[in-house]
Amino acid sequence: MSGPVDTAKSITKKRKRKHGGGARAATETDDATTQPVVENGAVTDSPEKGEDTKKSEKNGKDKSTKKRKVSHASSDEENESEGEQGAPSQADGDSDNNGDDGDDNSEAENGDNGDKKDAESTDLPSADALRLPTVEGEPQKFTELGLTEKTLKAINDMGFDTMTEIQRRTIPPLLAGRDVLGAAKTGSGKTLSFLIPAVEMLSALRFKPRNGTGVIVVSPTRELALQIFGVARELCQYHSQTYGIVIGGANRRAEAEKLMKGVNLLIATPGRLLDHLQNTQGFIFKNLKTLVIDEADRILEVGFEDEMRQIVKILPSEERQTMLFSATQTTKVEDLARISLRPGPLYINVDHRKEHSTVEGLEQGYVICEADKRFLLLFSFLKRNLKKKIIVFFSSCNCVKYHAELLNYIDLPVLELHGKQKQQKRTNTFFEFCNAKQGTLICTDVAARGLDIPAVDWIIQFDPPDDPRDYIHRVGRTARGANAKGRSLMFLQPSEVGFLKHLKEARVPVVEFEFPANKIVNVQSQLEKLIGQNYYLNKSAKEGYRSYLQAYASHSLRSVFDVHKLDLVKVAKGFGFSTPPRIDIQLGASLSRDKKQQQQGRRNYGSQPHSKGLKFKRKHDD
């Protein structure tokens, strides 16, 4: 039977299945977009598939019948070798329905000779059989890496030609199978640095859905995981391998179903990944060949150290290549590298020779502003830059919620992004802002790491960053890519100018910006009147005020950001209160725990104090 007929037959079988066939492992919203392309590719002969068919006929024309006779015997051997893993052996039972337990793209990719390839060997080739390109000299372009045509075509579609420094220095050794510990500033192109070798490995080993997961990428935040998933989708568009994502807040059952069908390239956040590793039956990860830990320092900062240790312990270590990327090298990162990387990893740091820790093309400044004038300055700035694309960073979820409600109420539209939102809301907001040509996003540091948001004009740090590293990651949301431009502005109170010394030590160049006093719109009286009359805004403002003080008290640089030096009357005016509201908060106790909770977005703001600590009580009326 000719190849195209077999493909059409398998697709007909797929359509008869109760649930419509195994969709490509991806997010629920991705299935609709990938499936039509797959079906068209399976039914019609594209030029790419025609070449594969000709090669197959040329190399094995006389042996095709013999290979088909062997197919069932090979499948039986596969069933025995798979041991207790039922899902892959069941899919291997009949060469005609290989795709039934896999995905549409797997069939579309193999096209005419897919059944022949499966019949030859259903076992996953060992790492000894892996032949990735060997790169000589100093490659500058992706075409010099010896990548597969499918990968090169995808990279070309993405608009990339010349590699960044981190890509030039990491991709060749990763293709050679080395473990790599990489350090590069944000916006340097790390994502493609680890995805290209991962996809090439999966392709070289001819991973099928029944083989389970071959690559796992661990990301610190859901938004960054979604972004990596988007890049992986573009990179894998011409490959047959499946890809998927598992993140907190998403439908766990749907994720488990896709994992059981087989996800070759998996992007995940640590908590949800550990959950599936421990509890999802049929999740095959015994064939794992590559583990990627992206933004390792951030993963450890937000409290996932225990989860990462368990994940590394659970995953198979034999023949596993590990790629660990971190913007900064801390003691915890070194500990994680020691338990996850094989002996003798390659350490690549592309930043240590740079004069500045931030990217070129980024104009950075600060403005000295009293606490009671901060909102007025922000309001005036946003009003004057309505045609720009701006990100404003705050220190807590409640501060973001209050300012979003206030600005939208007074007809200055903004989007908000923080850790207390439901996952669907966070995802929708993220992509809405990515696709917007102008607008303002106010957010916590949940958006500070790794997110590649196009064409951001301004980064405003309304609340101070925790340390210079956080500053660098915040401003890294602009001036991304080659020759890109961007500007950042940091608000500092007079008591906070000591932070400039820390930035200088971290090789961050900042200059003072001046904002003429006559350009500041004085809406203080209207603001206080609005907060006094609107119950919901008043309640939100009070929560924001409380959260601001708690976040300030848990600052890691308390020698600079000392809560005792704050003028609470001026701070309260910045939140729209004529006099400081009565609040009851706990300051000074369990600061490290509070800090950890703040970074995770799960902080218990406004909790009543039950232990020793510093209390701030104001006996004024609300």
Curated annotation (Swiss-Prot):
Residues 361-531 form the Helicase C-terminal domain. SMART domains: DEXDc (SM00487), DUF4217 (SM01178), HELICc (SM00490). Residues 11-21, 612-622 have a biased composition (Basic residues). One of its GO terms (cellular component) is nucleolus. Residues 598-610 have a biased composition (Polar residues). Residues 93-112 have a biased composition (Acidic residues). Its EC number is 3.6.4.13. Pfam families: CTE_SPB4, DEAD, Helicase_C. This is ATP-dependent RNA helicase has1. It comes from Neosartorya fischeri (strain ATCC 1020 / DSM 3700 / CBS 544.65 / FGSC A1164 / JCM 1740 / NRRL 181 / WB 181) (Aspergillus fischerianus). The gene is has1.
